[in-house]
Regions:
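Non-heme Fe(II) oxygenase catalytic core, chiefly the N-lobe of the double-stranded beta-helix
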Residues: 1-141, 146-199
Length: 199
């Protein structure tokens, strides 16, 4: 799910291919509804009342990057949104896992245990037959429901250009807004008056 690190997450995502490499660079999409459906009842019970904070700072730090607050989309001072691990789709009512590389801390749980749980859920979720891999051609356009689908780029030779234009469609505040807590990798925390949550 994209933009879960923003207080108001997107409800849909769009990618349009302009220039593609000769090989690799596909985009994989994973269905988080199907991933939820495959969970053991004991796992569903364990995670049903859990939530995780989501942060672009944290996910980028895992990859060795440090970005200053205010230096791009997602690097804001509104804090890290707290989102339930199980999300009910506002239109279909179907449950989906709300995880991904931006999820990093579960309140009330040791950080190592939380990371292990989140990594395990993500690993299980992103397996066949829940994956679709799109091999890009110039001019392709893919639209997905961001409320229940994860996506990621596949490796490619970075000496070749790969240009995809991304667009996000803003979510409905009733279903996509999440209160935030302070993000220790951001230089400031300026929540809205409704946000009283802290880490």
């Amino acid at each position: 799910m994209d933009s879960t690190y923003m207080p108001l997450a997107a409800k849909a995502g769009v990618l349009s291919a302009k220039v593609v490499p000769s090989s690799g660079g596909e985009t994989e999409f994973a269905d988080m509804r199907a991933a939820y459906d495959e969970l053991a009842p004991s796992t569903i019970e364990k995670i049903s009342k859990l939530s995780a904070f989501h942060s672009l700072y944290q996910s980028q730090a895992k990859n060795g990057y440090k970005v200053e607050t205010g230096k791009g989309y997602g690097y804001h001072t509104e804090g890290a949104p707290l989102r339930p691990l199980i999300k009910k789709h506002p239109v279909t009512g179907r449950n989906a896992l709300c995880i991904g590389r931006h999820a990093y801390k579960i309140p009330g749980m040791d950080d190592k245990e939380a990371n292990n749980l989140l990594d395990s859920l993500l690993e299980q979720a992103c397996q066949q037959p829940r994956l679709y891999k799109h091999s890009w051609l110039p001019g392709d356009l893919v639209i997905w429901d961001n409320r229940c689908v994860l996506h990621r780029a596949c490796p490619y030779d970075v000496s070749e250009p790969r240009v995809l234009q991304a667009t996000r469609i803003s979510g409905d505040p009733m279903s996509e807004f999440a209160e935030t807590g302070a993000d220790d990798l951001a230089s400031a925390f300026e929540p809205s008056k409704a946000n009283t949550l802290s880490l």
